[in-house]
Amino acid sequence: MSDADALLWVQRVEKRFGGLSALSDVTLQVRAGEIFGLIGPNGAGKTTLFNVVTGIYAPDAGAVSFGGVTVSGLKPHAIAHQGIARTFQNIRLFANMTALENVMVGRHVRTRAGVVGAVLRGAHTRAEEAAIERRAREFLQYCGVAARANDLARTLSYGDQRRLEIARALATEPRLLALDEPAAGMNATERAALTQLLERIRDDGATLFLIEHDVKLVMGLCDRIAVLDYGRKIAEGRPADVQRDPAVIEAYLGGSLA
């Protein structure tokens, strides 16, 4: 793949915490329009890499570019404005706000008024707020949680909270959706529904970059996969090829990939 094909380009990234090397010389490219999976044993550096990509951490070496623009070192809100949205392994909803309000908060990233303007609520802002609500309801419908629009986020089932978090991320109209273990805690029925939703998001034009411990889900969903182990990339390619890679099998001790 040429550099011109990459929407997200992680270039020789390193991240250290004291004497611990969490990421070492990691390079990968995510193409526009694909679902790209990042897997590896616990402690491999997957979430650290997500944190570097989304601006929570600055890399100690290397760089991250998105759409041809260097974004490493930018704050998370600036990276969100570039078109990267993220969900977290531990769901981070506003528990005492409704599902609709949660998505509206996400939508404010893409408005002229922003969150502060929504509080001040001038005439123009009120009209914009009505448009934001309509759009937020569309994202709730898209993600299958429209019926819970007026319910507090904390009252939703775990699966619906995951869907709500995705709806809020989509409300920013990202070019890249970064999902940190989106299937965590889901039962088989919820995982199947999630897979359908993620495929639909990809088919509608977004690019997905996900961490997931459910290797079976990753192998069936992703177009390409990278594998981290002890902070280093040990494999990258199509799921079928990665699954047969001796280094990957050794890292997982044959268990999850058997």
Give the residues covered by each predicted segment.
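Glycine-rich phosphate-binding loops of nucleotide-dependent enzymes
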Residues: 2-258
